[in-house]
Amino acid sequence: MIVGIGIDIIELNRIEKMLDGKLKFMERILTERERGVAEGLKGSRLTEFVAGRFAAKEAYSKAVGTGIGKEVSFLDIEVRNDDRGKPIIITNTEHIVHLSISHSKEFAVAQVVLESSSR
């Protein structure tokens, strides 16, 4: 049973501007593991990566119903890729989390569907 849905869209140029103060922004948004992946990226690929993670975390927090804040922070949510490259969310939840991330020339968008773990 679906228990939550969240979606977020972010302009890539907004993330690109925030990456000017790269380290501080990335430390606030990305987990240590995500920052390790980001270290190997440059230019537009780095912007897309960070924007996708930002949108995914915002979408997850909306699906949970809290938004980013006291109950859920950016660092409580980690986005990884499975063996096939599919993005997945790692967090402390009893729900099954379905994640989709997409990019265009100007935007990154993510959608999260939370499903009850009891079937």
Curated annotation (Swiss-Prot):
Keyword flag Transmembrane helix: no
Keyword field: Cytoplasm, Fatty acid biosynthesis, Fatty acid metabolism, Lipid biosynthesis, Lipid metabolism, Magnesium, Metal-binding, Transferase
Cofactors named for this entry: Mg(2+)
Superkingdom of origin organism: Bacteria
Entry keyword Metal-binding: yes
Compartments where found: Cytoplasm
Gene Ontology CC entries for this record: cytosol
Binding residues annotated for Mg(2+), in chain numbering: 8, 58
Record GO biological process: fatty acid biosynthetic process; lysine biosynthetic process via aminoadipic acid
Catalytic activity reported: apo-[ACP] + CoA = holo-[ACP] + adenosine 3',5'-bisphosphate + H(+)
Single GO term (MF): holo-[acyl-carrier-protein] synthase activity
Enzyme class name: transferase
Its job: Transfers the 4'-phosphopantetheine moiety from coenzyme A to a Ser of acyl-carrier-protein.
Family label: Belongs to the P-Pant transferase superfamily. AcpS family.
Official protein name in the record: Holo-[acyl-carrier-protein] synthase
Source organism (scientific name): Bacillus mycoides (strain KBAB4)
Lineage: Bacteria, Bacillati, Bacillota, Bacilli, Bacillales
